[in-house]
Amino acid sequence: MATTNDIKNGTVLKLEGQLWNIIEFQHVKPGKGGAFVRTKMRNVMSGKVVDKTFNAGLKIETATVDRRDYQYLYQDGADFVFMDTSDYDQITVSGATVGDATNFMLENQMVNIAIHEGNPLYIELPPSVVLEITYTEPGLQGDRSSAGTKPATLETGYEIQVPLFVENNTKVKVDTRDGSYLGRVTE
């Protein structure tokens, strides 16, 4: 058993028979009253995000989660096939478990998969990935009714907003947490 003082990003808690992944946490020590821990947690199965506050020092049950590096091989219908790079075992992960990570995954890309009792819980991508723009309209510099961005389709099929100067076949860096454009990549 752990206490709320052990909470950090990535910790998986068992609460009311469900597994919850800590996305954000903040230890708060107010001037009056006892300390507490404010968290934002994602339900591992449903993906629902909730805010929950725990009193400091409260005993909590953590789940043992094994995080391993896997290589994304291919999509098989609604499922995704990954290979463990240490022993070359392949696992199949449902599309629901992969979630929004599909927007940023290319074949042969390395990802981190969290596994609990032999079941994949979620996919962890690097904070940013480099992807190619497959289609975007030409940007007209003087004709602006917005903040100077335009839609662009990535090689994964996901659409992001990019600055007007970005053209087709340009490699860009994309934030995997919110899908935002981070910059052009020069080879």
UniProtKB/Swiss-Prot annotation:
The keyword Protein biosynthesis applies. SMART domains: EFP (SM01185), Elong-fact-P_C (SM00841). It is found in: Cytoplasm. GO terms for biological process: peptide biosynthetic process. It comes from the Bacteria. GO terms for cellular component: cytoplasm. Pathway: Protein biosynthesis; polypeptide chain elongation. InterPro entries: Elong-fact-P_C, NA-bd_OB-fold, Rib_uL2_dom2, Transl_elong_fac_P/YeiP, Transl_elong_KOW-like, Transl_elong_P/YeiP_cen, Transl_elongation_fac_P, Translation_prot_SH3-like_sf. Its main location: cytoplasm. One of its GO terms (molecular function) is translation elongation factor activity. Keywords: Cytoplasm, Elongation factor, Protein biosynthesis. Belongs to the elongation factor P family. NCBIfam families: efp, PRK00529.1. Involved in peptide bond synthesis. Stimulates efficient translation and peptide-bond synthesis on native or reconstituted 70S ribosomes in vitro. Probably functions indirectly by altering the affinity of the ribosome for aminoacyl-tRNA, thus increasing their reactivity as acceptors for peptidyl transferase. This is Elongation factor P. The lineage of its organism: Bacteria, Bacillati, Actinomycetota, Actinomycetes, Micrococcales. The gene is efp.
